[in-house]
Amino acid sequence: ETIKQKNEKVIIFTEFRAIQVFLKRLLLERFGLNVTTVNGDSNTNRRVGLTRQGIIDKFQETNGFNVIILSTVAVGFGVNKQKANHVIHYTRSWNPAKEDQATDRAYRIGQDKEVFVYYPTVVAEEFSTFEIKLDKLLSSKRELADDMLKPNADLKNELFELLNE
């Protein structure tokens, strides 16, 4: 409701077709939106200008509140979605780099609003849910990747010593 009142755009990422269909129906019932879904089954035809980026461009060109449902695998790389400033990872990828790449598409040149990223999570007091465990795993993978890509001073010195031997 808050996003609708602000007339902002939303990208929802999920790989699962059943969830895509469910969300599309829910958004139609709740907001009267005919939501576009782009996934591996999306028909694309370059000759008539129907490409995944073309479908996303059409979404971006509409004024006001709108939602698009995307598959991270189908559109995580190589397309820009900077008119949307709300990114919802409805289901999570096992690979944090894919998630980050998909999210980063909303931060491209032309984005003039603050970007909000959401990870809906089921929480239970009695036990650690799958979503909580997956979030911890993805955070750990991100930290490991950051450590390898941006080594601290000790690791840098150790690497230089190994290279100079």
Model region roles, listed by residue range:
Residues L27-F31:
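Short, surface-exposed basic-aromatic patches at helix termini and helix-loop junctions that form
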Residues E15, L23, V48-T51, K98-E99, ...:
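Residues at alpha-helix caps and immediate loop-helix transition turns in enzyme cores, especially N-
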Residues E1-L26:
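Conserved helicase/translocase motor-coupling segment
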Residues V38, Y90, P120:
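Hydrophobic residues at beta-strand termini and immediately following loops
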Residues Q20-K24, I56, T62, N66-T91, ...:
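SF2 helicase motor core recognition
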Residues W94-E165:
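A conserved SF2-helicase RecA2
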Residues K9, N34, E114-F116:
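Residues at the starts of beta-strands that form the adenosine-phosphate
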Residues I11-F13, V21, G32-V75:
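Conserved helicase ATPase core of P-loop NTP-dependent helicases/translocases
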